[in-house]
């Protein structure tokens, strides 16, 4: 979305989004999944506009269809407020080499402070800043939605113009939160970055956890649309929408 203070016509964009969704069908629930980059640079004024945009979306949905959407959102790298200070790949690699500490994580979480206000308003990431699990009942179908923060240790304005694939981090002890519960019929995982953006150790564990516990993976970041299926040697698979 990359909402910023120079954006115009947000109300019209909300109307177009609503028209793209066929709400004349008798849905049991109306859920909007946002795969990150709500803001352009993680600043407070950008989230004020995001509140306005989604407020318009909800109001028009209620007015035209009598349905209030539930909004689930994950952060992207544009949802981080770097306070206009650059962070290079070499700096991130230094943090990874020394081992992630609790202070490192607290510092990372703090960079999302204005995003958390927006996410918490939508009942997301209230208890954990890395993974949030939602359970939705659709008639006789029970759906688990895993929200993953894939943007920890993102770079910003790297002077070497280097991309940060292979740098991102997720706490290995948090991955049990995406475990598909026994009574779940269908599992959806949503995160902003594809798995290749994570550091090698994180990538292996995250990919295995997703493969074992996810039926549908929704990604952002790459700015190109594609749908594909990933299969393992033991027959496990999931569909990815990017």
Regions found by a protein language model. Give the residues of each.
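Short catalytic/ligand-binding loop motif for oxyanion handling, primarily in non-cytosolic enzymes
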Residues: 4, 40-43, 79-84, 153-156, ...
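Structural motif
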Residues: 30-31, 70, 143-145, 186-188, ...
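Extended active-site neighborhood of metal-dependent phosphoesterases/phosphodiesterases
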Residues: 51-166
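Short acidic, glycine-rich surface-loop motifs adjacent to enzyme active sites
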Residues: 181-197
């Amino acid at each position: 979305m990359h909402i910023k203070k120079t954006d115009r016509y947000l109300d019209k964009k909300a109307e177009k989004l609503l028209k793209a969704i066929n709400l004349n069908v008798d849905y049991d629930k109306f859920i909007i999944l946002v795969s990150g980059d709500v803001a352009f640079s993680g600043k407070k004024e950008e989230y004020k506009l995001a509140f306005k945009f989604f407020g318009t979306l909800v109001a028009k949905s209620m007015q035209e269809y009598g349905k209030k959407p539930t909004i689930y959102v994950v952060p992207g790298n544009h949802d981080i407020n770097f306070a206009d200070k650059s962070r290079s790949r070499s700096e991130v690699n230094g943090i990874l080499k020394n081992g992630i500490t609790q202070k490192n994580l607290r510092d990372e979480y703090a960079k999302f402070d204005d995003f958390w206000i927006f996410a918490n308003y939508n009942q997301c990431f209230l208890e954990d800043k890395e993974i949030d699990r939602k359970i939705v009942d659709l008639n006789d179908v029970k759906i688990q939605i895993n929200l993953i923060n894939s943007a920890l240790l993102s770079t910003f304005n790297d002077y070497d113009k280097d991309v940060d694939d292979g740098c991102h981090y997720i706490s290995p002890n948090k991955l049990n939160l995406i475990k598909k519960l026994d009574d779940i019929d269908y599992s959806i995982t949503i995160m902003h970055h594809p798995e290749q953006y994570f550091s090698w150790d994180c990538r292996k564990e995250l990919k295995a956890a997703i493969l074992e516990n996810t039926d549908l993976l929704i990604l952002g970041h790459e700015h190109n649309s594609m749908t594909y299926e990933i299969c393992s040697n033991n027959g496990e698979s999931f569909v990815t929408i990017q």
